[in-house]
């Protein structure tokens, strides 16, 4: 899995990069054929937003989440992506 992290109005520190990498590594337990991941972290006034696009076998998955801090936004994003990956895996098994 290739992971690309970009920040808009936020500096991507080493701690933040490690946190994102660890969280996205856990997504492989839901679907093991994740090819590329694009993560965009944004800060707009008081809103912290995280967006991600996953290129997986059989399609593309996108999710976005907001939080009071960047770590909460990333946690919300991972929860949404885990649900979507589970649904995607079930769809592929049905065919």
Swiss-Prot record:
Key words of the record: Translation regulation
Reported consequences of knocking out the gene: Non-essential gene, no formation of inactive 100S ribosomes. Double hpf-yfiA deletion mutants form 90S ribosomes. A quadruple yfiA-hpf-rmf-sra knockout strain is significantly outcompeted by wild-type after 4 days growth. No change in sensitivity to aminoglycoside antiobiotic gentamicin in stationary phase cultures.
Summary of the function given for this chain in its UniProt record: During stationary phase, promotes and stabilizes dimerization of 70S ribosomes by the ribosome modulation factor (RMF), leading to the formation of inactive 100S ribosomes. Converts immature 90S particles formed by RMF into 100S ribosomes. Crystallization with T.thermophilus 70S ribosomes shows it binds in the channel between the head and body of the 30S subunit, where mRNA, tRNAs, initiation factors IF1 and IF3 and elongation factor G would bind; however RMF is still able to bind.
One GO CC annotation: cytosol
InterPro entries for the chain: HPF/YfiA_ribosome-assoc (IPR050574), RHF-like (IPR036567), RHF/RaiA (IPR003489)
Gene3D superfamilies given in the database record: Ribosome hibernation promotion factor-like
Gene designation: hpf
A single BP term in Gene Ontology: negative regulation of translation
Induction: Induced during stationary growth phase (at protein level). Induced by the signal autoinducer AI-2.
Protein name: Ribosome hibernation promoting factor
Originating species: Escherichia coli (strain K12)
